């Protein structure tokens, strides 16, 4: 039996507005990208990327086989929503802070939007790195039809005028 190719699961797309957007399918690659973005790139304060992935607790329950994920793992399941929220609050945001090397980020601007189709958690904060201030926004979405989670990560530079 041959092994599957471990190609990077990332795509770069350009939106209609001309914005470049990186789309990841793997949580570890997303975190590595954030870490290297802050170390290497001058545009760390102006990044937009998305991540579409199965949360680790879902894959663990399905023995790392996406085909075995239960149909009930979606936004209509209280257990799934509770575990996803814990994953986001206790692991994902913490790992993003570590990848960015900004332990002071608190993501205190929190909100939750819920309807029949989906649940969206929004997190935001401001940070400073290399004497440059920026706003970070993270949106985590789970839908009613499957266990896949969509994460939207965006940083925007703050100018002196926008801070006031």
Curated annotation (Swiss-Prot):
It comes from the Eukaryota. It is a peripheral membrane protein. Gene3D superfamilies: Respiratory growth induced protein 1. Involved in the control of energetic metabolism and significantly contribute to cell fitness, especially under respiratory growth conditions. The keyword RNA-binding does not apply. Belongs to the RGI1 family. It comes from Vanderwaltozyma polyspora (strain ATCC 22028 / DSM 70294 / BCRC 21397 / CBS 2163 / NBRC 10782 / NRRL Y-8283 / UCD 57-17) (Kluyveromyces polysporus). GO terms for cellular component: plasma membrane. Keywords: Cell membrane, Membrane. Its main location: membrane. Pfam families: RGI1. This is Respiratory growth induced protein 1. It is found in: Cell membrane. InterPro entries: RGI1, RGI1_sf. GO terms for biological process: energy reserve metabolic process.
């Amino acid at each position: 039996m041959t092994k599957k190719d471990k190609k990077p699961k990332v795509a770069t797309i350009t939106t209609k507005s001309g914005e470049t957007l990186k789309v990841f399918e793997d949580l570890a690659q997303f975190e590595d990208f954030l870490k290297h973005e802050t170390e290497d790139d001058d545009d760390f304060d102006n990044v937009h990327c998305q991540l579409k992935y199965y949360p680790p607790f879902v894959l663990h329950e399905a023995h790392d086989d996406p085909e075995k994920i239960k149909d009930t793992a979606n936004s209509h399941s209280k257990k799934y929503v509770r575990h996803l929220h814990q994953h986001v609050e206790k692991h994902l945001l913490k790992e993003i802070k570590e990848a960015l090397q900004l332990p002071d980020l608190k993501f205190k601007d929190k909100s939750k939007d819920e309807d029949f189709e989906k649940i969206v958690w929004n997190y935001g904060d401001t940070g400073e790195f290399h004497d440059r201030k920026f706003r970070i926004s993270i949106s985590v979405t789970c839908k009613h039809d499957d266990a896949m989670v969509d994460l939207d990560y965006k940083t925007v530079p703050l100018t002196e005028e926008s801070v006031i």
